[in-house]
């Protein structure tokens, strides 16, 4: 969701059963008029993203096609379109109408005067003159590395970007007046997150020492500290204005927002830091000195909006309501924050218009994510009530309850418990859900990420079928502080999350309303990993499972996330193997349904191939469903429907004894 540069207008992308389109809301009097800008009417698996307004607010630039998580990979084509799918940049009037293709590429950024768009294609930066419909793309320069974070200077004379070089990275600056490229303050570390000073003379950026261990999915509570630097654009000289302490917060961890640094009107830099063990916003003078915590307390900041006058920050956090999100506001240069919203809903992604109008993407236990206006009294007014399907069963959904249970090792774990409505007596089959990530937190309502909004809907559906459902926020997830996220021995370093898996099953078994002999487990990605681990190590506790694109061999999966050689550290490779479901496959007895797309870029499809082969060899009952050319986060709406239909039918057969035909 983004605000127009002028007036009260906001845009966002809506996905209606696979039909992805851009919508605009504009204030007319005291009401909001909403219209669709683009007209894609097919569930074709083609995503749109990288949306932005032109500076005059009259047009919208966006990208259609490609993989926005792995932009360097070929465009996925799960709909098996014979012509294939390309990633292209388009422009369209904010009032709707015909779209115009500008060029092949991604990450378009329009210059402050609206005359030029810069973008990335094939790891090079290109520009196109927007004032001339016949103009051809021109490569700005020939550069090494992988560019991203294109950022125009406020005066439009420079373009800054981050240049990833593997184990190091630079901040590049192109001067349009001189037609020269330079890299400011280069080092052997990784420079990223560039932000301009208001006068276009300096750039602030983050400098991060590289992690040379080469192993992902392991705890990392400390490292050589990261820092914030400011460089002079003319000379290229830079200096440090702040450095993290040793220990907690020495590893850089950003918010969910696209931008991490904010240059304020008072010449301060606002930035995220975990110095207290919780992700907060801090401010430090551009001349250096001690940083001030703007958001003190035991909670985490999620998304951040920065006012056009550079004086105010609005952010979402779980302050005073750890399993929800609400909005808070604080002065950019310091002062006490104050609460803007509260209640039983989830107010997650704030957006500020130039005149101070505050919009937010919000959800709750009964309605999924939707745009709303936040009034001065904290009340919220939905912009698009007419967009909700008339047959949406909001009144039939239950409100999950917050529960806290003990893991097998005693750690306290949060979850959301879904209880069948109007059926308090008797014992029910139950299902445990594990989210993916693992850097995620499930909430007491529809999630703000589409993948987990779908999962929340699945949990509600299973509840409507008579299941007690427990969604688990296991260790190594977010929301509960640094030490919880960087849990000791998690993932490939020891699978300590299995304590939470076992604790969840035992918690359900102890409930008087649960049939302890019929507890199932399901999840996707990292949740698929924990589902497989549950079945491999505890088939006596979990009677059946649905595993969507799960990790089954860490030594295979780690190769997907960077250079990894299992032979380089045999002891670490041994622990990674022992932390894998395949290492315990001999004790896997319960039936499982395996689901994955074979163009998965997050979890190698070989994980499922190897697990299926092992289960087949030992006679463990399993079923499978493969989506050819589908990726990790299914792009086709009908693939989600198929996966969840098969999953619910599988549980009905093995946990309720319902024949397949029913």
For the regions a language model picked out, list residue spans one by one.
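Signature of short aromatic-glycine-proline-rich micro-motifs recurring in repeat-based ectodomains
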Residues: 1, 48-52, 254-267
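Conserved beta-strand position repeated across blades of beta-propeller domains
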Residues: 2-4, 52, 109, 151, ...
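Residue-level detector of Asp-centered blade-edge/turn motifs that repeat once per structural unit
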Residues: 5-6, 55-56, 112-113, 154-155, ...
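Hydrophobic beta-strand positions that form the internal "hydrophobic ladder"
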Residues: 10, 60, 117, 156-159, ...
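A flexible loop/linker signature enriched in serine peptidases of the S9 family
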Residues: 13-23, 40-47, 63-90, 98-107, ...
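Short loop/turn segments that connect beta-strands within beta-propeller blades
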Residues: 26-30, 93-97, 130-133, 175-179, ...
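Blade-loop segments of beta-propeller domains
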Residues: 32-55
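Serine-hydrolase catalytic core recognition
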Residues: 266, 339, 348-662
